[in-house]
Amino acid sequence: MIKIKMRNNCSRSKNFIKRIEQFGADIEFDEKSKIVFISDVHRGDGGYSDSLRQNRNIYKAAIKYYLRNDYTLIELGDGDELWKNKNLADIAYNYKDIFKILSEFNKKKKLYMIFGNHDMAKADKDFILKQEKIFKQIGRRFGKDLLNLYKNIDFYEGIVLKYIPAGKRILAFHGHQVDFMNCDLWRISRFLVRYIWRPMEGIAGFKEPVSPSSNYDKGTKIDMMLEKVARKERKIIICGHTHNDIFPKVSEGLYFNDGCCVFPSSITTIEIKNGLISLVKWRIEVDNNNILFVKKNIIGGPEKIENYFEYARNL
């Protein structure tokens, strides 16, 4: 039976850090652990407004690599696009192969799912039951890969990761908690995206103004606010939401952002392995025989996690 750790509401006025520390998932890890953070996948309906469509194969190659190499996958919010889409039916149909891979992570107890503003509906305790009823109206076995996963996993607002060698904690959450339009007013923003911006998407380069990923100045302000949260808490925090991949130098900050999966021709992730943290880009390349392949590059780090803990201690 699915357990939800927060009702589908959001307010910047509440102390969301304490809420995450109290109700979030707890993960202990050490220098032998391998963890990957991926956010803002925005799995959609396969149509023109499906932001993942162009990077589907890159994303699939990345998660297959992480499954094969025994990583714990933390989906850090906005995994499914539930602002543009009223339910999961088209998403379940178009991404059957993806949900099969994610289910393999879950069978190994190596999958954690965080909800963001675009999939806040997952915080509703009856959400999966409602989706199951919709699927049954379509066909008896429709959406079985998605349902097999979502009926057997918890959705959290955030995760507390404890690094055993140092006895220090890392906080991971989507990041919309500091964004008024996408937290307090998320239902209004969803309405605007679903019924106004989506039909206009693609027309003369139109972008939804409520999205930090479509508004660089807004995204940067949110990133600055999240860095302030990290300094105030004196903790490493890892977020998504703004789609801006961020990897600070040890002496510069404690706020990391894993970027997104929807920018043209590449996706970004954050990896923790051997006590080191790295920012990784996956993209399409062409070899000398004109064959396309997916290439993984480290674009930030690797840096020792303990160096950031030491920096936080001296703030």
Each language-model region and where it sits:
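Extended recognition/assembly regions associated with phosphoester-bond processing machinery
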Residues: 1-75, 79-315
